[in-house]
Amino acid sequence: MQYNGTARKVGDHIDTDAIIPARFLVTTDPAQLGANCMEGLEHGWVSRVQQGDIMVGGKNFGCGSSREHAPIAILGAGMPVVVAHSFARIFYRNGFNMGLILIEIGDDADRIHDGDVLSVDVENGRITNHTTGDVISCPPLPPFMHDILDKGGLVPYVRERLAAGDA
């Protein structure tokens, strides 16, 4: 899996209420949630996002309350990948469960700036910054995570396994 897009950089400790404020939790529709993605950080933030852009976070991205709406909002805004210094653990699990690709890169997140053009090679654990020429190595995801992501998240993955008699 390779993803190409423009970096949409946010800071440290971006909580789930910044990603999708509680007032927008009246739906689970990805398009509606995506239209309000990062509204708790900056009004209209999502208007700069193009389909396929890559969110780049700082430390502890996705902290705060556990809400599946947050990764759905990011996906609904058209961003299939979040690269960050680190993730809050509950957000990390929720993200993969919803089909959002999350990659931790530690201090290398500081080498990516808003507007940089990126390629993220999930299978080989490589992020190429075409703006600066930097190549960042990261651990590739384990095969079972690829299987979950390929199916669009944990629920579709389990449904398929149950239907096939594998579970």
UniProtKB/Swiss-Prot annotation:
CDD domains: IPMI_Swivel (cd01577)
Source organism superkingdom: Bacteria
Keyword Iron: no
InterPro entries: Aconitase/3IPM_dehydase_swvl, AconitaseA/IPMdHydase_ssu_swvl, IPMI_Swivel, LeuD, LeuD_type2/HacB/DmdB
GO biological process: L-leucine biosynthetic process
GO molecular function: 3-isopropylmalate dehydratase activity
Pathway info: Amino-acid biosynthesis; L-leucine biosynthesis; L-leucine from 3-methyl-2-oxobutanoate: step 2/4
Keywords: Amino-acid biosynthesis, Branched-chain amino acid biosynthesis, Leucine biosynthesis, Lyase
Membrane-spanning segments: none
Database matches in Pfam families: Aconitase_C
Catalytic activity from the UniProt record: (2R,3S)-3-isopropylmalate = (2S)-2-isopropylmalate
EC number: 4.2.1.33
Family statement: Belongs to the LeuD family. LeuD type 2 subfamily.
Function description: Catalyzes the isomerization between 2-isopropylmalate and 3-isopropylmalate, via the formation of 2-isopropylmaleate.
Known partners and oligomeric status: Heterodimer of LeuC and LeuD.
Protein name per the record: 3-isopropylmalate dehydratase small subunit
The organism of origin for this protein: Oleidesulfovibrio alaskensis (strain ATCC BAA-1058 / DSM 17464 / G20) (Desulfovibrio alaskensis)
Gene this protein is translated from: leuD
